[in-house]
């Protein structure tokens, strides 16, 4: 049996196959929420051509339930993937420390800013920096420090 690899970020490494009634709003690049799960649609095909049923391939956005607390705005529920031992690279690309790196879904949080707060499992974290090159319009990587 081929097990999917262990997740290393907010995106599940295994693609999900979904069947749904035809709906013009279900298109590639959109999001689908069902039973507390969040999916980013990779493809949606009307495989019969009759506008009756869709075959959808999607990526599930997984993570721990958290709360994004932007400065001067109401809190928002979100999924957070935490990596407690991510290498922090200096300007030469050398790992100089290990810090907490997180990924959040932009559809749930919007563009997280430095200085904002994330809370996961009753633990609060400050957003201290962006993880360079990780914002792809779906997921944003950020560096965190635990609030003492």
Predicted regions and their residues:
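Short, conserved turn/kink motifs that form compact alpha/beta structural patches or helix kinks used as
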Residues: 1-148
């Amino acid at each position: 049996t081929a097990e999917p690899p262990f997740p290393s970020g907010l995106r599940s490494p295994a693609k999900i196959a979904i069947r749904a009634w035809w709906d013009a709003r279900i298109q590639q690049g959109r999001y689908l929420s069902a039973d507390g799960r969040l999916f980013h649609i990779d493809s949606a095909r009307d495989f019969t051509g009759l506008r009756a049923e869709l075959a959808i391939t999607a990526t599930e956005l997984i993570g721990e339930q958290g709360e994004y607390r932007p400065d001067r705005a109401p809190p928002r529920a979100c999924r957070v993937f935490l990596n407690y031992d991510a290498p922090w690279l200096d300007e030469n690309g050398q790992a100089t420390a290990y810090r907490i790196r997180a990924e959040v879904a932009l559809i749930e949080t919007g563009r997280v800013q430095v200085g904002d707060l994330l809370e996961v499992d009753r633990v609060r974290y400050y957003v201290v920096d962006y993880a360079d090159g990780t914002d792809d319009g779906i997921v944003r990587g950020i560096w965190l420090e635990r609030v003492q």
